[in-house]
Amino acid sequence: MASLKDMRVRIASTKATQKITKAMQMVAASKLRRAQSAAEAARPYAEKMDQVISNIASAAAGSPGAPVLLGGTGKDQVHLLLVCTGERGLSGAFNSSIVRLARERALALMNQGKDVKFFCVGRKGYEQLRRTFEKQIVENVELRSVRQLGFVNAEAIAKKVIARFNAGEFDVCTLFYSRFKSVIAQVPTAQQIIPLEVEAPAANAGPAPFYEYEPEEDEILTRLLPRNLAVQIFRALLENNASFYGAQMSAMDNATRNAGDMIRKQTLVYNRTRQAMITKELIEIISGAEAI
């Protein structure tokens, strides 16, 4: 049995851990508000831009001058999985849920005879994926030194992806990230970004409105598609940022509660042990007095 001193040390250690987890919970809560506002503000712009480009793409469908980013290479043999995760842990299942979705997609594609490559954004995703797919990871971008996410960070990633696409390294690119829903709910999401997925009009939608574009649709798409790619990546990074702080806040709250339960149990054991030792000493004193 542990001595009373060991028990006191253990209780003090648990209390110190509880203070740390409580502080981390409060920091995550304060950062979550700003991150959530940024993610929610980026959604309408990203969704509307995707919709506008989809409308223009529908008008340019079949055009011989359509950008390759729109129609793709015409093949789907080589898939690039752009996996965006966090730089830090202590956030529950935030990182592992994104990696799990990407891993499941990779295995499904490989079972179909496809070639799979990984482009990792974030240290945690890279560390998990390299255990299984180290030879298939073509690039890893870390944002550890970035104090505040900006569009320039997403634009740099988009340029790297486009450069690899233009070099013929892949046919299809899918973006993986965690969509922020609430503090306790983050949804792992997969979104195809190359080639652009154009939604077919509904059967009962009626005649589509006619638009004239100036300049021509192909020229507009040539300019907007790289921009849209950066916008979608930026949105994913902002969603991830909010999801990370939401998951961390929830995880640290659970850790703080668990530490409180441990402290109560340890204190109960300590008090019972101390009481038993005092009772034993009293019995020994009384027995000695009676013997005299």
Curated annotation (Swiss-Prot):
Membrane topology recorded in Swiss-Prot or TrEMBL: Peripheral membrane protein
Alphabetical UniProt keywords: ATP synthesis, Cell inner membrane, Cell membrane, CF(1), Hydrogen ion transport, Ion transport, Membrane, Transport
PROSITE patterns, per database record: ATPASE_GAMMA
The keyword Ion transport is annotated on this UniProt entry: yes
SUBUNIT field: F-type ATPases have 2 components, CF(1) - the catalytic core - and CF(0) - the membrane proton channel. CF(1) has five subunits: alpha(3), beta(3), gamma(1), delta(1), epsilon(1). CF(0) has three main subunits: a, b and c.
Biological role stated in the UniProt entry: Produces ATP from ADP in the presence of a proton gradient across the membrane. The gamma chain is believed to be important in regulating ATPase activity and the flow of protons through the CF(0) complex.
Similarity comment: Belongs to the ATPase gamma chain family.
Protein name, entry field: ATP synthase gamma chain
Source organism of this protein record: Nitrobacter hamburgensis (strain DSM 10229 / NCIMB 13809 / X14)
